[in-house]
Amino acid sequence: MAQPNLKPCATPDFVGVNLRRDTVMIADNELASVSNVDFYSEPGVIRPRRGMSLLLAGVSSVNLLVKALTSYRYSRQSTTVYADNVAVATGITGDYAALVPFRPLNETVTYMFIASGNMKKHASTGTTKWGIAAPTDTPVTAAGAAGSLTGTYSIRYTYARMVGAVVMAESNPSPVSNNTVLAAQVLTLTNLVASTDAQVTHVRVYRTTAGGASYLFDQSIVNGTTTGSSTQVDTALTDLLETDNDPPPVTHWAWEHTERMFLTQDLNNPHYVWFSKRFLPEAVPAANFLEIGNPNDPVMAGVSHAGACGVFTRATKYQIIGNDDSGFVPIESSSRRGTICPNTICVSEYGVVFVARDGVFSTTFASIDTKLSDNIEGIFISQTVNGYAPINWDGAKTFFGQVWKGRYFFSYCSGGNTTPDIVAVYNFMLSHWSFYGIAITALAWEDENDAIIAGQSDGSIIKLETGTTDQSASITMSATTKEYACDEGATVRKLFQYVSVDADTNGETVTVSIYVDDVLRGTCSVSTSKRTSSLFDLQAGAMGFRWRAVITYTGQLTPKVYQIIAYYAPLTPL
């Protein structure tokens, strides 16, 4: 039993790691290092993180995940996009790709639009091109049998995807046909060349009025029918032909904002941001683009947040204000900070969280960035701190970030690794970090399933923060406290005699190692079936200026360490 004249030095509630300062100088409630410790489920307690379970076994490394859409969970694995484990799009080239759910005007289904080197869209009906290419063949008109048309006429035609009489998407028009002069005749139509695009159901014919220059809708013809005739009187023609239904350019990033699809990472125009017509993501007029900065600072990504639109370049970021009527205008942020790892960008109630060269930040685009990574600064400046290797920026393209339930999960490459090998977890409530020793190649949040999911290099898609094992494998946890100098400070020598461990190990064995001035002075094997304070002797002559504890556990349950108290006697200087 501890002697009554000994003084206690107790650990307070723990909040997370601090790599910014010397282990003697960090706050009493901060830790020098942690691995696989969960500070979210029970703040202040040392306990293993929650586990992970297998959702899908894949075929290759998962490098993009999107939350479930209807009955599908989408992932990009190498150059293929999968809906669950079914390949739905191939040839997905480039370092980045974006998968964006969008329900276009008149549609009854939501499509997953795939921005990549091969622009596609997928729904339960199958995979088709994103947008419809215009006809390139020139139609031919001629005078036909007796009819009601008199004057000079020409036509143009488009390709369309229709359901019944409703147009879902339509291309730009063909070249203008020849002019034909009629005198109470029918206009015959030929060379209405069929589209080879599987999504096209109809050819839509637009005709002038007599001597007119505008093209008005005349009729729809089933795709594959290459001839026809126009008989309607001029007053029966309806909608004006649209000439700005361009399919989107090849881009590798897309997002929805104000019912439009915005697109960037255009390799031919790296500083462009394109935007579609409202409600019509497959129509991106050639004039609908913004030049952001200059080509030497390419746009990396964009997001919609709290009614605002923001874009990141490598060096800075911009808020895009305005609308179709007033025009869109980019305004550079007061914090000139961009990102080279766009998959770390995450929209959340805490702002838009992202990773930059100098740390993890939250932004609104309209005000100064808020830094979240002060306590782990060392890994951003090429330092190895308390066993944590610095970030390897050569792997920045593979970094991922996701906010879920009050935490930001940041998966990155450390040391010499070129694929992610560790996850840093920021707790917004505690304003501190923990680290998980798991290799994650993609992250996503599924609100409908209340889950954070992840991809791994073997193609597996897993659910994080569930259960107490990693797919039946044990979890190894460790935590190292600060160097406690006790009330007297680091200049007064002390004799440490006992240590008390307040824990509930759930029947498991947790090891608590006590170091005095970096010398191991006691190894405590703590095993309890309920919360208990256990007292342990330290080695005789455990004298020194400061002490620390190292807590370790490997297993498949959830032991908890609440507090450690070292009992000591201050020694009078000679």
What do the PLM-derived regions correspond to, one by one?
Residues S78-T79, G117-N118, T258, L267, ...:
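Surface-exposed loop/turn positions within WD40 beta-propeller blades
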Residues F113, W255-T264, V303-T313, V353-V355, ...:
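Hydrophobic core segments of beta-strands in well-ordered, beta-rich domains
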Residues M300-Y318, T339-V352, R357-D358:
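Beta-propeller domains
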Residues C309-S334:
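Surface-exposed extracellular loop regions of Gram-negative outer-membrane beta-barrel proteins
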